[in-house]
Amino acid sequence: MANIKSQKKRVLTNEKAHKRNVAVKSSLKTAVRATREAIAAGDKAAAEAAYKVAAQKLDKAAGAGVIHKNQAANRKSGLAVAINAL
């Protein structure tokens, strides 16, 4: 544990941010997984609906700095290509 007062505060802040980032990443993975499952099932309408949710979550995560904006773009692009191939 840190001895400096400001560093003790930063430890608490970092823990809070870590929990928030883990929660965002978890919901992001769930949304992407739902899209991939709809694609695997061959249901284009469901895949497009799931993609809309996943794309929104990817953009929000990138905006919050949880993931890099290029990673969000690459994931959205990969999902879109898979949906268009249906």
UniProtKB/Swiss-Prot annotation:
InterPro entries: Ribosomal_bS20, Ribosomal_bS20_sf. Pfam families: Ribosomal_S20p. Keywords: Ribonucleoprotein, Ribosomal protein, RNA-binding, rRNA-binding. GO terms for cellular component: cytosol; small ribosomal subunit. GO terms for biological process: translation. One of its GO terms (molecular function) is structural constituent of ribosome. Coiled coil: none annotated. NCBIfam families: S20. Binds directly to 16S ribosomal RNA. Belongs to the bacterial ribosomal protein bS20 family. HAMAP family: Ribosomal_bS20 (MF_00500). This is Small ribosomal subunit protein bS20. The gene is rpsT.
